[in-house]
Amino acid sequence: MKQYQKDLALLLSESRALFFKEGLSLKDGRPTPYFVNFGLFRTGRLISELGRIMADYLVDHELQSQFDVLVGPSYKGSALAVATVEALWLNHQVDRRFDYDRKEAKTHGEASQSAARFVTGALEDGCRVLIIDDVVTTMATKFDRLSPLTDEATARGHSYHPVGGGLDMDRQQTTAVYEQQHPGGPGETGQE
């Protein structure tokens, strides 16, 4: 196990973001004995540590040169994107841009004529985009992130190149958690 993986496990425990309880269910309806709430990473130290862990992961897998912009979906992914690019710079001297989406397009101020769905303007024509988020269950939400990117590119007359996604926690289980309550068998997931 890599040090950043150990650090994540300790951070999940310390922050109580990982907890166990009967009667929990995932967004797709599957029962689960545990849940992870990255919303509890709500201090400067915790989000900074989480960003460092993600930056270390990206560098360990040699992904830091594979993207230009790190996009974090609203809401939890936004803070994660900022913390990760900051840690890439501070710990690895890798400078990358970040952006995150709005739930509704902005039509005033600097976005008066563009109805911008992204905040920082980091998405430039031809840029390579890595999407980063906290947890995945079925990947449906992550694939949904491609639509706002495509819409933004079309509105600006640009092209963006999604290169992948980075996650803190993969909830895609390969076997059912409770066989009696979820008789579908290994690998079956509900609709997210």
Q: Which residues are covered by each model-predicted region?
A:
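PRPP-associated nucleotide enzymes
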Residues: 1-132, 137-192
